[in-house]
């Protein structure tokens, strides 16, 4: 099936559709199963590119003989072939401010050009011939590692420098940098909005413009120049990083001072090894183990600095205009620096601009409650943030895989019965939804710590993203229904709760989580004794019980003045009936149970709750056919405004206790008003909720 690439579904998530379009990809061809694809022919690409990529594969192979993850780190350092680096190692490099080490940048391109010039000079070639050899070497290398923004920028600047050498002209770096940007944008205008393009050119400008102004009186001199270069590049990218990620790494400066000298030695030695690997693979294989100690040291330094205090300094949300103001001052620094009396003023102005870039503009108006249903595919992840700033995460999402089963409309007949009977193996997906979706969304929404994490039940589509979340954020208390389950993700969650000394509470009816300013989340289900009674009635032992897992899902009622919301986990009809018997008060918002399964959201529940807004957390083209048409129809017949994460992306509801605003990441056209229902979607104004 040919379809549009997915766009970003969560707050702060990059738009994947635009990112692919910048690379020339406008559609995705999706096969329904692994057997639907068959390789009929190999090696039919354009001959020069095919030869270059074959050479790359040949020289990467010996590098991967090193133990994991060191071989892949070395391949990333030399050739940008960082696929397969464990996520925890990649995250350590990111938190230490060393992620640039794992990708090819101007350093590698410059070394290739310089090495080619040296070899051509040793062969006593003329200037024109030497320049041609070096330019060709840069072209081949850029093709080998891929034309990323940093590689393209470095290649164009290298060619301009070589042209100046051939013409016996002096190189002017501002002109070269500007020309590289113009050439790259002429080929791909949308690259202007790419963060990688912006970071690459900002870092290069910092190296060339700011570093000379920041040279410290250190000995030896190479250390002074290294410190200045590191500081200049980091200052230049700081506003961009603050605006895009809301955090910076204070460990980056010392980490780079220690790691970059080793990288400076590793890269040329590694290039010599790769050339040898292409010519004499057996000899190269004998020399590869000599690279293990320095690469081991680089990896462990990254891990050390990632754990060091200050490796992540959280910033309040930074507006892009604030980042632009910081750059306006930074761009003026080199010119103002030449007027010596203004040096102190320049320093203060620069610091003030950077500080302003990290200070948000205070929001006007009364405190608000946020309920954000994140887009995590076929799963649940809901953020509650009270008006006092306390944050609670309900579930963490997580994809699941069902053996070799096909998905969506192509699922074979009877598959769901086999899944229910556990005849089809159920495993966690290799996609870490916690690291890739939940954590970035929480960061963007300003979450710095989680006062509580609530796991409604231990199925993979609710627990799969929580290990990454618990490892990343400080957590005050963890609640779950206390029903054992063999899910590896759940086992890991319990291990992290113990390791990080998080308070553990078995959720039971009547427990309350206080969110500040009168807001709270109260546990309505399960009641005390329910789990034991269920086991006694079914004869189940104390171990895992699939029937009990959904039946004992934690149900929460959220309250803030007149705002109310009911979060129902994966409960089904029997539990809904029990809740109605216990007494349910009307709620403005209903998180539809079990992703819209036909076994939930009964007429009795809708009559008792009388919701005005319903949110279904569901994956696009999911295997189960969720939401079931009968559930959607019941909601429509009840006049409920229904949002779906597969269509709308994340759904964000904000309330000041008297009004509610509904917004979606994939904005619907215009403002959809639900007359008499007190909700306006996609609008900056809301209407009063009144009584439910």
Where are the model-predicted features located?
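Divalent metal-coordination and catalytic microenvironments
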Residues: 77, 105, 146, 196, ...
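C-terminal regulatory/interaction regions
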Residues: 219, 277, 281-368, 378, ...
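Binuclear metal-dependent hydrolase catalytic cores
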Residues: 370, 398, 407-411, 421-519, ...
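Active-site-proximal loop/helix segments of hydrolase catalytic cores
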Residues: 374, 394-404, 434-441, 455-471, ...
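Conserved beta-strand hairpin/beta-sheet module of binuclear metal-dependent hydrolase folds
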Residues: 268-271, 365-444, 449, 546-572
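Hydrophobic alpha-helical transmembrane segments in multi-pass membrane proteins
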Residues: 29, 84-253, 269, 315-366, ...
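Membrane-interface helix/helix-cap signal primarily in integral membrane proteins
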Residues: 1-100, 403-404, 424-425, 431-440, ...
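Membrane-interface amphipathic/re-entrant loop segments adjacent to transmembrane helices
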Residues: 36-50, 57, 91, 95, ...
């Amino acid at each position: 099936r040919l379809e549009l690439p997915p766009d970003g579904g969560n707050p702060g998530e990059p738009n994947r559709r635009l990112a692919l379009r910048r690379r020339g990809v406008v559609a995705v061809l999706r096969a329904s199963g692994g057997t639907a694809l068959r390789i009929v022919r190999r090696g039919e690409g354009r001959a020069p590119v095919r030869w270059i990529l074959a050479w790359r594969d040949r020289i990467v192979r010996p590098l991967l003989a090193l133990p994991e993850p060191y071989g892949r780190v070395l391949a990333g350092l030399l050739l940008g072939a960082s696929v397969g680096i464990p996520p925890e190692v990649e995250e350590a490099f990111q938190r230490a401010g060393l992620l640039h080490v794992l990708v090819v940048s101007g350093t590698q391109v410059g070394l290739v050009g310089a090495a080619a010039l040296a070899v051509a000079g040793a062969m006593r070639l003329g200037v024109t011939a030497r320049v041609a050899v070096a330019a060709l070497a840069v072209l081949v290398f850029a093709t080998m590692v891929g034309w990323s923004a940093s590689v393209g920028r470095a290649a164009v600047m290298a060619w301009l420098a070589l042209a100046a050498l051939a013409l016996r002209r002096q190189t002017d770096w501002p002109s070269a940098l500007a020309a590289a940007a113009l050439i790259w944008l002429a080929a791909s205008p949308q690259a202007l909005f790419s963060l990688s393009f912006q970071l690459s050119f900002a870092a290069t400008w910092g190296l060339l413009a700011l570093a000379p102004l920041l040279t410290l009186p250190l000995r030896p001199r190479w250390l002074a120049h290294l410190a200045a270069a590191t500081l200049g590049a980091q200052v230049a990218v700081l506003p961009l990083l603050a605006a895009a990620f809301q955090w910076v790494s204070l460990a980056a400066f010392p980490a780079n001072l220690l790691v970059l000298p080793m990288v400076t030695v590793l890269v040329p030695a590694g290039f010599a090894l790769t050339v040898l690997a292409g010519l004499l693979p057996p000899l190269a294989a004998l020399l590869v183990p000599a690279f293990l100690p320095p690469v081991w040291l680089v990896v462990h330094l990254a891990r050390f600095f990632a754990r060091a205090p200050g490796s992540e300094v959280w910033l309040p949300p930074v507006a892009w205009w604030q980042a632009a103001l910081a750059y306006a001052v930074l761009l003026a620094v080199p010119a103002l620096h030449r007027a010596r009396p203004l040096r102190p003023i320049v320093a203060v102005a620069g610091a003030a601009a950077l500080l302003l870039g990290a200070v948000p503009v205070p929001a006007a108006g009364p405190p608000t409650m946020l309920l954000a249903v994140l887009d995590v595919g076929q799963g649940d992840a809901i953020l509650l943030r009270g008006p006092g700033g306390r944050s609670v995460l309900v579930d963490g999402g997580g994809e699941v895989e069902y053996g070799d089963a096909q998905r969506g409309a192509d699922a074979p007949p009877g598959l769901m019965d086999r899944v229910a009977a556990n005849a089809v193996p159920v495993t966690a997906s290799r996609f870490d939804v916690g690291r890739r979706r939940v954590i970035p969304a929480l960061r963007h929404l300003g979450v710095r710590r989680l006062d509580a994490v609530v796991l409604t039940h231990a199925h993979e589509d609710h627990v799969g993203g929580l290990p990454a979340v618990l490892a990343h954020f400080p957590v005050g208390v963890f609640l779950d229904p206390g029903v054992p389950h063999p899910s590896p993700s759940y086992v890991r969650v319990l291990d992290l709760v113990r390791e990080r000394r998080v308070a553990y509470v078995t959720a039971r009816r009547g427990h309350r989580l206080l969110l500040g300013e009168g807001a709270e989340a109260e546990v309505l289900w399960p009641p005390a004794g329910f789990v034991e009674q269920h086991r006694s009635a079914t004869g189940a032992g104390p171990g895992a019980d699939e029937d009990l897992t959904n039946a004992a899902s934690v149900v929460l009622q959220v309250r803030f003045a007149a705002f109310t919301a009911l979060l129902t986990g994966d409960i089904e009809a029997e539990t809904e009936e029990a809740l109605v018997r216990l007494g349910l008060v009307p709620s403005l918002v209903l998180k539809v149970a079990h992703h819209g399964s036909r076994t939930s959201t009964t007429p009795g529940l809708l009559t008792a709750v009388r919701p005005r807004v319903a949110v279904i957390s569901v994956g696009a083209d999911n295997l189960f056919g969720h939401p079931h048409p009968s559930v959607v129809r019941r909601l429509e017949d009840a006049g409920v405004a229904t949002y779906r994460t597969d269509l709308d992306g994340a759904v964000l509801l904000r309330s000041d206790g008297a009004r509610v605003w509904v917004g979606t990441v994939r904005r619907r056209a215009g403002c959809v008003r639900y007359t008499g229902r007190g909700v306006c979607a996609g609008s900056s104004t809301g209407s009063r909720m009144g009584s439910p």
